[in-house]
């Protein structure tokens, strides 16, 4: 089980990403638009830098929905390998069969 503070910190970051997504996209579009003047683009970059750092989607960490584990994360199931193995062994994941040879 991951530290609760780490999981909560990531949840807060996800909330900030969602909150600032529109504003960030607008400013990025202005900053990358080559038809505008350099001053306007630079101003957009400065405003982009003023946004909270944790509102950047890059700072989000994929975490297991069950344990909060940050590593060995399976995107398709949103779980870590350990959680997938445990639930798969119990037969709680449809279509997942434990292999044996």
From Swiss-Prot:
Molecular function per GO: rRNA binding; structural constituent of ribosome
Alphabetic keyword roster: Ribonucleoprotein, Ribosomal protein, RNA-binding, rRNA-binding
Annotated InterPro entries: Ribosomal_uS14, Ribosomal_uS14_bac/plastid, Ribosomal_uS14_CS
GO cellular component: cytoplasm; small ribosomal subunit
Keyword Cell cycle: no
One Gene Ontology term from the biological process aspect of the record: translation
Signal peptide location: none
The keyword Ribosomal protein appears for this protein: yes
Any Pfam family hit: Ribosomal_S14
Classification via HAMAP family: Ribosomal_uS14_1
Quaternary organization: Part of the 30S ribosomal subunit. Contacts proteins S3 and S10.
NCBIfam families: PRK08881.1
Family: Belongs to the universal ribosomal protein uS14 family.
Function: Binds 16S rRNA, required for the assembly of 30S particles and may also be responsible for determining the conformation of the 16S rRNA at the A site.
Protein name: Small ribosomal subunit protein uS14
Organism the protein comes from: Beijerinckia indica subsp. indica (strain ATCC 9039 / DSM 1715 / NCIMB 8712)
